[in-house]
C-alpha cells in the first residue's frame, strides 16, 4: 500500500487525509501543535485508520518514506523538510492540487469538470461567494471552496460521481443535465490563495479571475515579483481569464501581459483596456464579448445591496464569469438581488441610536482598510490595529484624515499606528488596546461627534489577539450586539471580560 503524509490538522489537512484514505493510501498526518481539540480529532481519525502525530514535525529518515506529501495551505512551501522531500524525489503537493487531481481523474475526458479559480490580494472571497450564488441560481451544482473556508478536498469527498444524464452546451461553457438522482457536480468555484497556487502544479481552471494585486504576504513570498508570479501562474493555466481593469497594478500590465483576457471597469467603456470586457454604463453592467459585438446590458448595478466601488468591481467580475459560463440574465439578476454579502467584509452588524456598526475584520492590510473606510458614510469612528503587516500606508492614512472623526487603536500595532498618525498631523486617536474597550468607547465617540458609523477595519492581521480574522470579527459582533441590547449597562461587563 502506498504511503502518504499530510502536514497540518486543519480542515484542509483532515479532508485531504480522508480523501487519500478513501483512495486506498496508508495515511499519516502530523501537526506541530497539541490541544484538547486536536487530541479529540486524533481519536476520531484513528477510528478511520488514519494515524495522527501531534506535537511532531515530519522527518524524512530511514527507509519508510512516504511516496506523497500533501501540505495544508498555511504550511510554507520552502521549509527545510519540503525542500528535502523534493530533493529525494518525493512528490509534494497542496491540498487543492490533490482535490483537482481527484475530481479531474474521476471525470471523463469528453466531459471534464470545469473550475472557476479566483485569486487576488483583496476581494476574492466576496467575488467567489457571488459567483457561486449566481451559478447556483442557474440551478448548477457549483460549490464554493478553497480559501473561502470549505476545503476543496471536502468537495471531492462529497462527490460520488456524475448522474446518468448528458451535457448541454452553453455560450462559453456547458452544463450537465441529470437524469438520475445521483449526486453530481457541474462546476467547482474555488477561491485560491497564493499559498494554494504555489503548491498546485497542474490546477488549470476553465475560467481564472484576478481581483486585485497589492503588496501582501511578503514575509512568505519575499518579493513583490515572486508574489505576482505565483498569482499569475493560476491565470496562465486558465482557459479564459477575467481581470479587474480598475486595479492600478494589473491595468498597467494590461494587454502586453494578458492579450486575450476579458477586462472590467466600473468607470465605463472608455476605460476598458481591451475591445472586449464588462463595464458599467448608465447604471447597468454592460457586456461586450468581442471587438465587433454590440454592447449588451446584463443587470442593473442597483440590484446589488453591498456598498462601495470595490463591490461594483466584484460584481463586474462575477457577472463576467457567469456570462462566460453561459448563464442567462435572469439567473444573474435573481442571485445578485438575493446576495446578502459575506461575513467580516463590510458586514452590517446592528444600528444603535442611529449609528451603524460595521464589521470589516477581513481588512487585514492597508489597501483593504482604505477601501473599507472609503465605502462607509462619514464621519466614521474607526477601530484599527492588530498584528501589523508590511505595506504602503499612505492611502490609508489619507483616507483616515478625510473620513475618520476618531481612531481607536487596538493590538500590538497600536503604538506604531499612533506614531504614524502623529506624523501626518492626525491627533484624534486613542490607544484602547482591546476590542472590549474599543466598542463601548466607539459608541460614546460616535454620539459625541455625531458620527453615523462605527467601523472595525483593522489594516492588520489578527494573530496577536485572535486565532484569525473571523474570530476577531465574531468578537466585535458579539460586543456590538451586547452594547445595542444593553447600552451602558454592558460597559462594565465588557471591560471586566477584557481584564
Swiss-Prot record:
Top-level taxon: Bacteria
Top class in the EC scheme: ligase
Q: What pathway is this protein said to act in by its record?
A: Cell wall biogenesis; peptidoglycan biosynthesis
**So what does this thing catalyse?**
UDP-N-acetyl-alpha-D-muramoyl-L-alanine + D-glutamate + ATP = UDP-N-acetyl-alpha-D-muramoyl-L-alanyl-D-glutamate + ADP + phosphate + H(+)
Please give the chief subcellular localization of this protein.
Answer: cytoplasm
Task: Output the Gene Ontology terms for molecular function.
Answer: ATP binding; UDP-N-acetylmuramoylalanine-D-glutamate ligase activity
A Gene Ontology biological process noted in the UniProt record is: regulation of cell shape
Which cellular compartments is it found in? Cytoplasm
Q: Which keywords are on file for this protein?
A: ATP-binding, Cell cycle, Cell division, Cell shape, Cell wall biogenesis/degradation, Cytoplasm, Ligase, Nucleotide-binding, Peptidoglycan synthesis
Q: Which residues bind ATP?
A: 120-126
Which GO CC annotations does the UniProt entry carry? cytoplasm
* InterPro entries with a match to the protein in the record: Mur-like_cat_sf (IPR036565), Mur_ligase_C (IPR004101), Mur_ligase_C_dom_sf (IPR036615), Mur_ligase_cen (IPR013221), MurD (IPR005762)
Q: List the EC numbers from the record.
A: 6.3.2.9
- One Pfam family from the UniProt entry? Mur_ligase_C
Supply the PANTHER family for this chain: UDP-N-ACETYLMURAMOYLALANINE--D-GLUTAMATE LIGASE (PTHR43692:SF1)
**Entry similarity comment:** Belongs to the MurCDEF family.
Its name, as the record gives it, is UDP-N-acetylmuramoylalanine--D-glutamate ligase
Q: Which organism is it from?
A: Nostoc punctiforme (strain ATCC 29133 / PCC 73102)
Question: Which gene is transcribed and translated to give this protein?
Answer: murD
